[in-house]
Amino acid sequence: LLWEKDGKEVVFLERVDRRTGRGCIACADISEGFWREPVAVIEEPFHMSFPMCFEWQNELYMIPETEMDQALNLYRCVEFPYKWEGAGIYMKGWSLVDSVLWSQNDGNMQFLASEYDPKDDFYTRYHAYEFQRADGQIKCRDLGRISDEYTLRSRMAGPVIEDKVPLAIVQRSTPGIYGYSIQFCKKEEYLPGRIVKEILPS
């Protein structure tokens, strides 16, 4: 995930320890026009991936994939881009992956994530939740399943591209091949579990 702040351009990414197979969130500074060695910025005793950053009330947050912890783990940036702190653990017992900021309503942040089919984790279905601020605390409200059917393309591949025509980036898999391709869809026409209108060829 590319992010620009305070005159710096950085890339947040998953860095995997090949010995353990466990990933952490790392950051590579590209401000000077070349790629610096990624530095770990968030490490936990469980696998992490898919760093999703978003700004909320003048603060930078990240919600990486922490499905192995069976919870949503939210982090706040204390000093950009290398220092982060835990901001809350939510929806314990859920195994949700690849959260993407979908919309903002009255200061609340709505996310679209995916849950696995317990019989085959190549198949997923969408689940939504919302972060709210109340009494100085961040609370999470479960908005429930958005689609009932497990499919091979009910999983986001990156943040919504906010342009004249906002685009949702959808990951497509095939049986036995994870992340076979991606698909760009008009956000307002994208209805999980239904036929998706393609903007660009896969």
Segments predicted by a language model, with ranges:
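Carbohydrate-active catalytic/glycan-binding domains of CAZyme proteins
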Residues: L1-S202
